[in-house]
A protein has these predicted regions:
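Glycine-rich phosphate/pyrophosphate-binding loop shared by adenosine-nucleotide-utilizing enzymes
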Residues: 42-47, 61
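A conserved beta-turn-beta hairpin within the catalytic core of GNAT-like acetyltransferases
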Residues: 53-63, 120-121
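Conserved acyl-CoA
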Residues: 77-96
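Conserved beta-strand-loop-alpha-helix junction that forms the acyl-donor binding cleft
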Residues: 97-109
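Short amphipathic alpha-helix that is part of the acyltransferase structural core
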Residues: 1-23
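A short, internal acetyl-CoA/4′-phosphopantetheine-binding micro-motif in the GNAT/acyltransferase core
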Residues: 64-75
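A conserved beta-strand-loop-helix scaffold within acyl/acetyltransferase catalytic domains
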Residues: 15-37, 46-57
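Conserved catalytic-core motifs of GNAT/GCN5-like acyltransferases
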Residues: 100, 120-128
Length: 128
């Protein structure tokens, strides 16, 4: 799993320059391994998510990282990523799915697609 994490952190960093310190990001993510699930989609894309109980006693699936290589970015690959998370959530009796990483979500097309799939796209966050 560690080699998969490192591979995709490096690919995303090369494309998007999205991590202040990729090695530090890798070390943080390694600490999440007991809860982390990673699914690669034919070396085109990846999604990483954690499954854990929330404070209300319900299981939640929270997306930690998703990335698609530029040549494969489309609504179809994104829909596949989301469906994979939904399938995992159902198999693990999760009651909620949170999609919260901020790479690419400023794209209105992605937000519209999420909305069509039943997701709320209005979140409250503050970057510090």
């Amino acid at each position: 799993m560690e080699s998969t994490i490192l591979k995709w952190v490096n690919i995303a960093q090369e494309d998007l320059h999205c991590f202040e310190n990729p090695q530090q990001t890798f070390e943080i993510v390694k600490g999440m391994i007991p809860y982390l699930h990673i699914e690669e989609i034919d070396d085109k894309a990846v999604v990483a998510y954690a499954i854990y109980p929330d404070f209300r006693g319900r299981k939640a699936l929270s997306e930690v990282f998703m990335y698609a290589k530029p040549e494969y970015r489309s609504g179809l690959i994104f829909r596949d990523i989301v469906r994979r998370m939904e399938t995992a959530a159902e198999k693990n009796a999760c009651k909620i799915i949170n999609i919260s990483s901020n790479i690419g979500y400023k794209d209105d097309r992605i937000l519209r697609l999420l909305s069509l799939m039943g997701y709320k796209t209005d979140t409250v966050s503050k970057e510090l």
